[in-house]
């Protein structure tokens, strides 16, 4: 049985989501059309509304519906600290920890020369302007511990060298509750060299 062009378009659209291959996209499309047409319509409306109303915060670059997000407007936040993360999901993870009360800057990515992502694509100029505005005293680089995240952290640290705020990096170490025999060797090596 040949699929309709509309069904193929839906499958292709679903494949744009991270981690969704052809088979998963087909299963989702068939499920929505066969078992949950009302859910499919709600999803379509929610996507349309999000695309129309969600924008980047003028200060920190995260997602918001207002020109400036609620975190940036919160007077209780520690304004001398600025935590740099790759994505809004990373920002949410830091917030869930409950241990950070400063402000954020969301890069919306990381350097990846192989993928054609350079310093202009991650808003480095905007970050530098924010970090050197005289208010920020500590910039905490919380990029991921991947090759791209490390490269991004290095470029940020070099760009800010001697320009104002101190630059710190998240510590690496053995996760709480883990057993050493199951921890990867790189993490053990970093935990030993960065011990306090």
From Swiss-Prot:
* GO MF annotation list: DNA binding; zinc ion binding
Question: Biological process (GO) annotations?
Answer: DNA recombination; DNA repair
Annotated coiled-coil positions are: none
Zn finger (C4-type) start-end: 57-72
Q: Does the keyword Protease apply?
A: no
Keywords, in A-Z order:
DNA damage, DNA recombination, DNA repair, Metal-binding, Zinc, Zinc-finger
**InterPro entries from the xrefs?**
DNA_Rcmb_RecR, Rcmb_RecR, Rcmb_RecR_Znf, TOPRIM_dom, TOPRIM_RecR
- Which positions fall inside the Toprim domain? 80-175
Which PROSITE patterns is this protein grouped with?
TOPRIM (PS50880)
User: Known Pfam families for this protein?
Assistant: RecR_C, RecR_HhH, RecR_ZnF, Toprim_4
Known role: May play a role in DNA repair. It seems to be involved in an RecBC-independent recombinational process of DNA repair. It may act with RecF and RecO.
Q: Which family does it belong to?
A: Belongs to the RecR family.
**What is the protein's name according to its record?**
Recombination protein RecR
Q: Please tell me the species this chain comes from.
A: Methylibium petroleiphilum (strain ATCC BAA-1232 / LMG 22953 / PM1)
Gene designation: recR
